Amino acid sequence: MESRASLSILALLLGFSQALSLDQHEHVDITSRILTINNVLLIGFILSLSLCVLLVEGSSELLLEGDILLPKGRNGLVCSDSSCFWKKSSDGLVEVPYTLSSVFSFTDRTVIASAMASFHSKTCVRFVPRTNQTSYLSIESKDGCYSNIGKTGGAQVVSLSRFGCVYYGIIEHELNHALGFYHEHTRSDRDKYVKINWENIDPTTQSNFNLKNTNNLNTLYDYSSVMHYGRTAFSINGLDTITPIPDPSVNIGQRKELSAIDILRINTLYKC
């Protein structure tokens, strides 16, 4: 029993090591990092149950498309009115209150603040420390990188696990979900721009590629969006699950930060 437990812990640590090393390779897009980290941490959560070891704060969540929390207060991911978006104040700024878990180190907090500042410098969105607001982001180190879509009301968790999620681009990705943005590959006109290779996707995960009835804000499909899946997301054989059309050589997925079109969409949605 002891030997089996030791092997399980070793496998877990190796998984963490592989997930964290992704940040060292610029060819790995942000969504691929998120999916890998979430898979590793899910395995860690399962092992922690069997070994009675608490590895991260919080519990395993049911995630859609790899990093989207299914909201409990509304029908699926459908947002039919402005209640899903954060309100603009009279000064023209959109304030998004947040709290930050005490488990984050000074370095973690610096990275999170830097990612938030990127929104401040390019949009009218302002992430502000919560005072007494009812609706706010509760940024915590749970078991993965994930968020709701848009404002759900009350305290809504944005998970940035300290075991791999506290990186500039990943934080931008999850905060952009919280502002109301879906993954780019699920937008309603997706099939004009990419081909989904269903034969390379496990049937149990094909729902991650379902189209959404999205408001595309009269913007172009953005292959370089921070919200775009990488080529092999949810692949069962290492082959591409997403192929750009008509030119399959086009780079897809963002490796660093919000794209110009990501910024345009935020400013358009919130009328900055």
What are these regions (language model features)?
Residues 2-272:
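Zinc-dependent metalloendopeptidases
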